[in-house]
């Protein structure tokens, strides 16, 4: 069963365009697939969970989105031994895809996914903290402090949207880091 979880809003809407390119390849090759478009934050988690719980023995689960969408999908997955995971990168950073060596046009990436006969093991990390209901998985990195603050701000940043439209999305993180450094409150327990 070939399933796609699509975040059309990734990279300020470029995800929808990239998905159309990938979908055209699937239709041209007459490949059977199911696609699910995310509607809200956290939806990719639910979709991945439901797909993995459907009872199929061989699931090919492909994310069309950025690192955030991929993270949601990985955390929603169950029965990992039955799932082959892939990603068509459409985000502004695409650290996961880069780390996995995924490069090329959407057409090239979908071609590789369809023709790949070899499985690769992907390491995942797990983190939990006080008040955490369930440990979270991560594929690339986990941050705390300033790093986590910048990533959280980037999720809702109008600056990110504007820079993505100018094809400068990676500068979002530099801008938000500098901005956050000037807004942090510093405390010291040291005596004066």
Residue ranges, per PLM feature:
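ATP/NTP phosphate-donor binding region
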Residues: 1-61, 71, 75, 108-110
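Conserved beta-strand termini and adjacent loop/short-helix elements that scaffold enzyme active sites
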Residues: 36-38, 88, 127
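Catalytic core of DAGKc-family lipid kinases
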Residues: 3, 79-84, 91-188
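Active-site phosphate/pyrophosphate-handling residues
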Residues: 68, 72, 149
